[in-house]
Amino acid sequence: LFCLLWVTVLTLSFAVPVLADLSHRKTNLEVVIKDHAGQPLPDAFLTLKMKRHAFRFGTQIRDHLVAISEEEFQVLSAREKQALMDPATEELGLAAHTPSWQDAERYREVLWNNFNHAIPTNGMQWIQYNNRGPEIVDKVVNLLKTKQFTVKGHSVVWPRDRWPTPDQFRSSVNQINPSIFYHQLLSDRLQDSGILGRFSDLGVGPAITDWDVLNEPMNNSYYADVFVDAGFYSSNTETFADFFKRAKGVRPDATLSINEYGILNAPNDNNARAYRDFTADLLAAGAPIDVIGVQAHMSRGNVDKASMLRRINILAETGLDIEITEFDTRDDA
């Protein structure tokens, strides 16, 4: 009895501040039932059922794993099946898992039952999209839409000196032609002819109105470095701001985001302040940014609730909407 009472007291002491923190997410709802003549029915019995959350519960998905049919799956080699899964297992030194068709079905079941928003992980990335085309992306986006999901395009520009930048534009190539690099980027990613135009109401693909335009720019300045050195821009800020301007020119209807990692789960607030200032500089340069995105790859004990809230409030100083874009937890978290 003592143990039960102690647990109850502990639970209540924890619940009170948590519920208080969530008070801004609640409101009173008044429902008036009327008859066909518009007269109130005071004794009416009403049953309400939520059909859809207004809040977007989102997750990144393995595009091909969601889109593939059983017939297509069964003819894959073991290595090809492994490639459908998260490659991070190998990065963590774990043995690659070879999924069964039942695994694929369970993956989808968890997706349909727990989320209403999804971000295809790889299919829209520059090199992946160029090499494999839009077939898988079209299929998965259309499937998500039939399930009443909203979809975010990820990502228009990820300015890394490695994947997903096409091989011929990486610094490991002896002779990079900055002009070809620049104009190919614009054509493929930031013009009507590119990915933004294709996945629009005027394009041939399913329309996507929410895009990560610039992914991880604080940690990847490779494109800006090349283009500034070539004289196309005067600074990295001007470069990245122009990417947003071009994206908005192609898709004035779209919500455009910047996205960065190492903010909420950093050892201190310095990254949050740097991200705030980085984004503010882009806004001052005329970048039409709508959302500041924050990845949240969490592991055990690396941040507490107060620190996360403080960092979110730092980002709120930009005046932009804030979105947690890539939340996940390690198995040991």
For each predicted feature, which ranges?
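Bacterial N-terminal signal peptides
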Residues: F2-S13
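Beta-strand-rich domain onsets/edges
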Residues: P17-V66, H117, W126, K152, ...
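Conserved, mostly hydrophobic/aromatic
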Residues: V31, A118, W211, I292
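Aromatic-lined carbohydrate-binding surfaces of glycoside hydrolases
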Residues: D63-H64, T121-Q128, F149-R170, N215-N219
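Short, acidic/polar
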Residues: A67-A88, A95-W112, H183-I195, N270-L282
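Catalytic domains of carbohydrate-active enzymes, especially glycoside hydrolases
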Residues: A83, L94, P99-Q125, L143, ...
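Active-site cleft segment of glycoside hydrolase catalytic domains centered on the general acid/base Glu
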Residues: Q128-K139, T165-D277, N302-R310
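Active-site clefts of carbohydrate-active enzymes
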Residues: R162-P164, T255-A266, V294-R300, L315-A333
